[in-house]
């Protein structure tokens, strides 16, 4: 039985995850991802041929977003090698593992039910911390430890769709 309910905000976590899985299957040298397929299977998602490929172009767009975020973080870290990395709405992102980055402090912020999934399916890195929060309540910023002289970089992939405009 699937761990995520169909047609829910939480189920949208599968979009970038499935994109990463498809890319790792088709082009493992270009898009290495040792986590995506394992997590999809653990979540109990249907990855049969028809279910998997009917939305593959949408998933590929999510994949491209993920790798663009990795590229931007990498470029920032070249200029600020000791910077803190913060993923707002981290979902089931495995950017740290994809980037093979175990040296920078990293914070993954998301809702309680999502952080519970992260903690079940994605092992924490040595300098990584999951933070349960409501991103509309900026008190989460107090939970992030960083040195302004070293820098900080934020990502927010696929997140803004869920915010309401005022």
Name every feature range the model reports, one short phrase each.
Residues 1-86, 90-133, 148:
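Rossmann-like AdoMet
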